[in-house]
Every structure is written in structure tokens, then in C-alpha cells.
């Protein structure tokens, strides 16, 4: 396919135009008074949303250079969303400000590499300052407030906070497993079931059942646990045939799955003949064996291992574990509601507790503690229902973001929300960090960008951005604008907070993409194919001229 190439200023301006188009559509949603955006669907009713990453995903531009610019900013929004579950719109607004000011200086003759170094230095300093201002989460109410802001619903915030404490046996558990499921009932309900999550994902992306979300979801699957490698499909076939006859999907957890065995599973999944997912077992050596045994007890299965005289060729369905649901991503596997005996599970938990007491080293004790947390914590399931399919998808996505947001708050603490934290750390850049020339210009660009989120929040609330920024910059640290009421308050006291992880991720990702824009000297894009000519005479249909 023929390519188009643009250089220097033309290349950067094309990218910037795409960035601006996307950012202008996304930034109107920022803050409590953010506006909505209507998204047209090919089928069904349009979707109305104010979620930045959802809007960004929908935008496809026609011009090849603008399209690339928009795609780069989508990456900022997606990366921030993946890491922290929120801050996508903030990241987009920051990226737009950094790129606009940066390109203006590059066009005036500044050295892009000098500006890039200045931006990086400024962002590092601000990140350190944000972390030093962070306040640790101490109560369930603080988690509820943070999650409630992200979900735009106080009750959902309270449920998420309750879930984080329930999977921690009454203590805040930032690593606890919380899943969000679709439900036929209206509203949002919380239940805690037996289950666990381990940090190994699917071996091949072809196993994903939902490509957009990158997930493989198995309902009521059989679970095969093997302590060795599986490469020969002949060993696996007898058992596969039995599972296929049962009509259930299959999760395979083994040391490794490769060669013919893997390709057979993938081909059958693609053809729709048989749904399965292959996952590597967590841990190494003896720890791997112990974790496989944990999963076996949780799911009511047996580990197929030569040491106990079991082999794949002789394995039968009663040796397999089962669970209500299994969700596998590229990074981890979540087993919900394993069918194992509660008595055996309690015995296993007791055994691990004794092993912790007798552990020889802190490292061994720590690893045993991780296993204990996975087995005893369970899985909190938030069941989400809504009136329509479209509303259900939007609500589920928002709650998943709020869960990640709450975990981010528990991990690194919170800072004042409403754009105030970024603006009030700007004073540490007053001396340009002792840098000079283009590097000092880079620091000034960061300083100017720190006001951008608050300006946009004020603008969306119908207030004068310049006046609001000037007022908040002169307030004590932690005080700022409550855009919902138009009053200036102690933000943390009023429950208006952001996880510091969200704020710093937004700034770091925006700076990363801005540096990329500023140092771009050429863009290579696919040349648009000419449209096929219309059928001859199509516009000469009798009596229809002029339409």
C-alpha cells in the first residue's frame, strides 16, 4: 500500500490537530459539572456518556496524520485507565496543554530535546511533591468517598469500600479480589464467595472470548491441574473428548502448554468447536506444587502428578475441579466460587497458618502469607443490573474503574481533588529547578499545564477559569473549588479527593506522549484509498433529480 510522508512542522501540526479534535470532545466531561457526549451506534440507540476513555475509543478521524495524533492520545487515556481506573480526562487535558505550549516553542526555534528534558525534570519534581502531600487512607468512609467520586454514585462507592473490607477479614485489603458481573436484577448487589486470583494469564491471546476487554470468561468450567508440561496432544485427547461430551468449557493450569497440545486447543477455540483456556501454573518449584494443591482444594479437583501416580492418559472427569466462573486476562486468572469442600479449605488454611508460624525466613513467611490471603480472602462479586443493555455496559465499566480507583487510593494515598493538588504543587518549579535555556522552557511548560485541569473543571461549571485558578493558587494547600456548589472549601474534609496514583499517572503519561509529539520529525501514514465510483446513472433515477 502506498504511503504518505510528512516532515517537521507539517508532521507535528497534523498530529496536533488530531490530538485537539479528540481532547476537545473528551475534556467537556471533566469535573462534577462535566457535560455529556452522545455516541452513535451502528445498531440500537445512541449511548450518552461522560466517561473519557469510552469517548476516546469511539473517535476515528479521516485524515491519516490527524488519525495518528488521536490514536497517540487514546493510548494516554487507556494507559492511565489501566493503571489507576480514572484520570483519563485529566491526562488528556494535560497532554493537550503540554503539546500546545511545547509545539509553540519548537516553532519559535527552541530545541525539542532541551524542552523534553525540561518537561521530564519538571514532572519528576511534581510527582515527588504529590507523593509527599499524599494522605494515607485510614477509614472505610474515605475509600467510599474516593470510589463514589469515580463512579459518580455515593452508594456504589460505599459498596466498593465494604467489598474491600470484606475480602480482608474486616481490614482494608488493597490486593483483595473484587470482580464485577452483569446481573438480571436491577441495581448493584455485593456478595462474597470462595475464590482466588493468581498472577498468570492465558498463554495465547486467541483464547480471549471478549477481544475488546482482552478477557476469556468461562461459565461453570472444568478445571484441569497438571504439575508437568503438556506438549503431546495424544496425552490430552482422551480427557478432552470426555470434557467436550459434557458440553462444559475447560481451564487447564499446568507448568506449561506448548506444541501440538496448545495449537489443538487454539484451533478448536477459533472454530468454535470447544471453549478452553490454557494458563501457566503460578510460582516455581515446590511453591508451584503447593499453589496447585491450593487451587485443587478450592475447586474440588486433584493435581495430576506422577509423584502421586496420576497421569493425563488415565485422568477422568471426577479428578477435575469446577467453579461457577473463571475470568482470565493476559495478566491474571480469577476463580469465582470454587466447588471444593469448605471443611478441606478450612483445614488447608489452618495448615498454612501453622507453616507461617514455623517459617525459617521472612521471605518464606511472606510467600506463605500471600497464599493464605488468596485462599482465605475470597472473592467479592459486585452484581450490576440496569434497564437496558447499553446502560448496563456503561454502568459496569464505570464500576470497574471505581474499583481500580479505590485500590489506587489504598495503595499510595489520596490528595485534594478538583485539580487543586496539581496547581498547588506548581510553586516547587518557581526557580525552573536551576535549569537554563530550552530546559527551563520545558519546566515552564509543565508549570503552565498544571493549571489546565482546574481551568477546564471551572469552565465546565460555568465559572471564569482565570479567576478560579488565581483564587485556588493563593489558598492554603488542600483547599480549592467544589465545582458542584461553586464554593471554596477544604477539599479532603469535604470528601473531594483523588488517589495520588491517578494524579501522578495522568501527569506522567501526558508528559510521555508530549515528549513524543515534540521530538517527531516525520510521520509515515497509509494513503487513503480512493472511493469506488458510483454506479453509472445512479443519480438519474426518474423523478428523483435534485435529491
From Swiss-Prot:
Pfam families for the chain: Cpn60_TCP1
UniProt keyword annotations, A-Z: ATP-binding, Chaperone, Cytoplasm, Isomerase, Nucleotide-binding
The EC number(s) this enzyme carries: 5.6.1.7
Superkingdom of this protein's organism: Bacteria
UniProt-listed InterPro entries: Chaperonin_Cpn60_CS (IPR018370), Cpn60/GroEL (IPR001844), Cpn60/GroEL/TCP-1 (IPR002423), GroEL-like_apical_dom_sf (IPR027409), GROEL-like_equatorial_sf (IPR027413), TCP-1-like_intermed_sf (IPR027410)
Location(s), subcellular: Cytoplasm
One GO CC term, this protein: cytoplasm
Residue numbers binding ATP: 29-32, 86-90, 418, 482-484, 498
One GO biological process term: protein refolding
Keyword Transmembrane belongs to the record: no
Catalysed reactions, semicolon-separated: ATP + H2O + a folded polypeptide = ADP + phosphate + an unfolded polypeptide
GO MF entries: ATP binding; ATP-dependent protein folding chaperone; isomerase activity; unfolded protein binding
Function: Together with its co-chaperonin GroES, plays an essential role in assisting protein folding. The GroEL-GroES system forms a nano-cage that allows encapsulation of the non-native substrate proteins and provides a physical environment optimized to promote and accelerate protein folding.
Assembly behavior: Forms a cylinder of 14 subunits composed of two heptameric rings stacked back-to-back. Interacts with the co-chaperonin GroES.
Family: Belongs to the chaperonin (HSP60) family.
PANTHER family: 60 KDA HEAT SHOCK PROTEIN, MITOCHONDRIAL
Listed name of the protein: Chaperonin GroEL 1
Gene source species: Corynebacterium jeikeium (strain K411)
Name of the coding gene: groEL1
Amino acid at each position: 500500500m502506498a504511503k504518505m510522508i510528512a516532515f517537521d512542522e507539517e508532521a507535528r501540526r497534523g498530529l496536533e490537530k488530531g490530538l485537539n479534535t479528540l481532547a476537545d470532545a473528551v475534556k467537556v466531561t471533566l469535573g462534577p459539572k462535566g457535560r455529556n457526549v452522545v455516541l452513535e451506534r451502528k445498531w440500537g440507540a445512541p449511548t450518552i456518556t461522560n466517561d473519557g476513555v469510552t469517548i476516546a475509543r469511539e473517535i476515528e478521524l479521516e485524515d491519516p496524520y490527524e488519525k495518528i495524533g488521536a490514536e497517540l492520545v487514546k493510548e494516554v487515556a487507556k494507559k492511565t485507565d489501566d493503571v489507576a481506573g480514572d484520570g483519563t480526562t485529566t491526562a488528556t487535558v494535560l497532554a493537550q496543554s503540554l503539546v500546545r505550549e511545547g509545539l509553540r516553542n519548537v516553532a519559535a526555534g527552541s530545541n525539542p530535546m532541551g524542552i523534553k528534558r525540561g518537561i521530564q525534570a519538571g514532572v519528576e519534581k511534581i510527582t515527588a511533591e504529590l507523593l509527599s502531600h499524599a494522605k494515607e487512607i485510614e477509614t472505610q468512609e474515605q475509600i467510599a468517598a474516593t470510589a463514589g467520586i469515580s463512579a459518580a454514585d455515593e452508594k456504589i462507592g460505599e459498596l466498593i469500600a465494604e467489598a474491600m473490607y470484606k475480602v480482608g477479614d474486616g481490614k482494608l485489603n488493597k490486593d483483595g479480589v473484587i470482580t464485577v458481573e452483569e446481573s438480571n436484577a436491577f441495581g448493584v448487589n455485593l456478595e462474597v464467595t470462595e475464590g482466588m486470583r493468581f498472577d498468570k494469564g492465558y498463554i495465547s491471546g486467541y483464547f480471549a472470548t471478549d477481544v475488546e476487554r482482552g478477557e476469556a470468561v468461562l461459565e461453570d468450567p472444568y478445571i484441569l491441574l497438571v504439575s508437568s508440561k503438556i506438549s503431546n496432544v495424544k496425552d490430552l485427547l482422551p480427557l478432552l473428548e470426555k470434557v467436550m461430551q459434557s458440553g462444559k468449557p475447560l481451564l487447564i493450569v499446568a507448568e506449561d502448554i506448548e506444541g501440538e497440545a496448545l495449537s489443538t486447543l487454539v484451533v478448536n477455540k477459533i472454530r468454535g468447536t470447544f471453549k478452553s483456556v490454557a494458563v501457566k501454573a503460578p510460582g516455581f518449584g515446590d511453591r508451584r506444587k503447593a499453589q496447585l494443591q491450593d487451587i485443587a482444594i478450592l475447586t474440588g479437583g486433584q493435581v495430576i502428578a506422577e509423584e502421586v501416580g496420576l497421569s493425563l492418559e488415565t485422568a477422568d472427569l471426577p479428578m477435575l475441579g469446577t467453579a461457577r466462573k473463571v475470568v482470565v486476562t493476559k495478566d491474571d486468572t480469577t476463580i469465582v466460587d470454587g466447588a471444593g469442600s469448605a471443611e478441606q479449605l478450612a483445614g488447608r488454611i489452618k495448615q498454612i497458618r501453622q507453616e507461617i508460624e514455623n517459617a525459617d525466613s521472612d521471605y518464606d513467611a511472606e510467600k506463605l502469607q500471600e497464599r493464605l490471603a488468596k485462599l482465605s480472602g475470597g472473592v467479592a462479586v459486585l452484581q450490576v443490573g440496569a434497564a437496558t443493555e447499553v446502560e448496563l455496559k456503561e454502568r459496569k465499566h464505570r464500576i470497574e474503574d471505581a474499583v481500580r480507583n479505590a485500590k489506587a487510593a489504598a495503595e499510595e494515598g489520596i490528595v485534594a481533588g478538583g485539580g487543586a493538588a496539581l496547581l498547588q504543587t506548581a510553586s516547587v518549579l518557581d526557580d525552573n529547578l536551576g535549569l537554563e535555556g530550552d530546559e527551563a522552557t520545558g519546566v515552564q511548560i509543565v508549570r503552565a499545564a498544571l493549571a489546565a485541569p482546574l481551568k477546564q473543571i471551572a469552565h465546565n461549571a460555568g465559572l471564569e477559569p482565570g479567576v478560579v485558578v488565581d483564587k485556588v493558587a493563593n489558598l492554603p494547600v488542600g483547599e480549592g473549588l467544589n465545582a458542584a456548589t461553586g464554593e471554596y472549601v477544604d477539599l479532603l474534609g469535604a470528601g473531594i479527593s483523588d488517589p495520588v496514583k491517578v494524579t501522578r499517572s495522568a501527569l506522567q503519561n501526558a508528559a510521555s506522549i508530549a515528549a513524543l509529539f515534540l521530538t517527531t520529525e516525520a510521520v509515515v501514514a497509509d494513503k487513503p484509498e480512493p472511493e469506488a465510483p458510483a454506479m453509472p446513472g445512479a443519480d438519474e433515477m426518474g423523478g428523483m433529480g435534485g435529491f
